């Protein structure tokens, strides 16, 4: 996906996708899951493809030192707008970096972070290995890598629920789909992504679902008062089988070996 594509997508992504109940639920569920694995603040966090900061700004509020990296000037401009509304002490804990995820090592000066996040970026990357390698090289030994990816095993659900039966039949063995933002996306499996991480000496610790019920029902008439209840249900589903296996996206958390912290 071309980097400049986000200049057209930044507004619908920030103003619609993240502002919706579904977007708020995604952010909250990922945050809860992250807090079970992150070291305590003021640990350093690199958010690769962090967009407008919806996932990393709450971490900065909690005391973490955050570097938000994104290749899109349009998305970083939205991050600057949102950051300007934060208290001074939160703004001081956030720095914005314009670069591709694949170039994160050079863009951050070779810094090693306590945690590296990459949520919702892999679906838009044709060649995932260079990005995964960069994520793993940016994390310190013993640090956490957190990745959210599109679930290749559930691609038939959405077209089936829309009664697009031909599309659903073809999706069982598909490796991607035409996404909700109008661009083609690529899907992963927990097992396949886990193997990519292990090749970089990063061992998977746990995996979760993220969207289950919220992806299947129309929440356009929902309001903010429902978010807390929806999050509670999605959190419970996210760690139980068979529910997590049916999630539209999955969240994989892994840890880098303590004795692996090679220079680049």
Model-based region annotation:
Residues 1-41, 54, 58, 75-78, 144-172, ...:
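Conserved class I S-adenosyl-L-methionine
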Residues 46, 54-104:
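Class I SAM-dependent methyltransferase SAM/SAH-binding core
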Residues 117:
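A conserved beta-strand element that flanks and buttresses the S-adenosyl-L-methionine
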Residues 120-121:
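Short catalytic micro-motifs in class I SAM-dependent methyltransferases
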Residues 129-144:
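A short glycine-rich, Lys/Arg-flanked "PGG" loop and its adjoining helix->strand segment in the class I
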Residues 183-201, 207:
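Short alpha-helix
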Residues 206-264:
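A C-terminal cap/extension of S-adenosyl-L-methionine-dependent methyltransferases
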């Amino acid at each position: 996906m071309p980097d400049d594509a986000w200049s057209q997508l930044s507004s619908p992504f920030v103003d619609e996708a993240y502002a919706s109940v579904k977007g708020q639920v995604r952010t909250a569920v990922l945050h809860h899951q992250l807090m079970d694995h992150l070291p305590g603040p003021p640990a350093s966090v690199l958010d690769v493809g962090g967009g407008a900061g919806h996932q990393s700004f709450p971490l900065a509020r909690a005391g973490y030192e955050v570097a938000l990296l994104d290749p899109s000037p349009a998305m970083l401009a939205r991050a600057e707008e949102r950051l300007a509304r934060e208290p001074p002490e939160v703004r001081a804990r956030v720095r914005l970096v314009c670069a591709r995820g694949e170039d994160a090592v050079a863009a951050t000066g070779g810094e090693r972070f306590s945690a590296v996040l990459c949520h919702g970026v892999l679906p838009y990357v044709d060649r995932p290995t260079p990005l995964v390698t960069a994520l793993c090289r940016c994390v310190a030994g013993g640090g956490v890598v957190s990745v959210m990816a599109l679930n290749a095993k559930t691609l038939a659900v959405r077209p089936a629920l829309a009664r697009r039966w031909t599309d659903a039949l073809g999706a069982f063995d598909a490796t991607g789909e035409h996404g909700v933002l109008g661009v083609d996306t690529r899907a992963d499996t927990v097992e396949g992504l886990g193997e990519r991480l292990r090749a970089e000496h990063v061992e998977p610790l746990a995996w979760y679902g993220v969207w289950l019920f919220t992806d299947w029902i129309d929440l356009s008439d929902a309001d903010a008062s429902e978010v807390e209840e929806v999050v509670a249900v999605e959190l419970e589903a996210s760690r139980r089988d068979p529910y997590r296996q049916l999630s539209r996206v999955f969240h994989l958390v892994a840890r880098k070996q303590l004795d692996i912290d090679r220079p680049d």
